[in-house]
Amino acid sequence: MTKGWGPLGWATLHSISALYPDNPSALEQEMFSRWLVSFTQTILCPSCMKHFSDAVAAYTHMNPTWKSSRRGVVEFVMRAHNSVNSRNHRKMYTFAESITELEKILPSALAPTRRQEYLSYIRSDWMKNMTIEGISTAPKIRELNMIEENYWSKRSFEWYELSVFSDINVSPIANVSSSLTNSGGALIPRLSMPQGGFRLKTFGRIGPLSSLRS
């Protein structure tokens, strides 16, 4: 990943991992999976998008149930971030160092603002791209906005809450490369948007809005 990824993207990922429920319902896990697809496919830097998609695929192959808990999502995001740091020959952060940095650069009270700034940034940039690829991102950006408005923005967190996960593995994700398509002979599917997208309405495509806990 390059500077094109931007600190706002990582701020969004880290805050979402902190907001994720400790024991998400099946609906919440499906919502997060779809959010992750839209997030990945709207990354502005093509190589960053490729690297992140590969990281998700590799990690899911190693740990298929990682979306079933906040612990799992926090671990994935920290390992993905350290994977980028390792690739770019930058400092890799321990869990404690990561939390200290996040408390400084992303106070929990400012997290919703940073996520909105990220959404505005990618929307503005993609709307300048009048190609088929650029136009096709519009539904994904709308989906990110809808999930932010109806779910993430209604939740809150404090960084200290994550101290219970101090024993998680934060090392770089192994075997992540831009050409990753399989591992051990088993196909790793690329991320793709489910047909019709995801709607958070009174009765959405995968269940009632009331099933999502605030």
Residue ranges and their predicted role:
Residues 1-42, 46-214:
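Mid-to-C-terminal functional-domain signal that highlights helix-capping/loop sites
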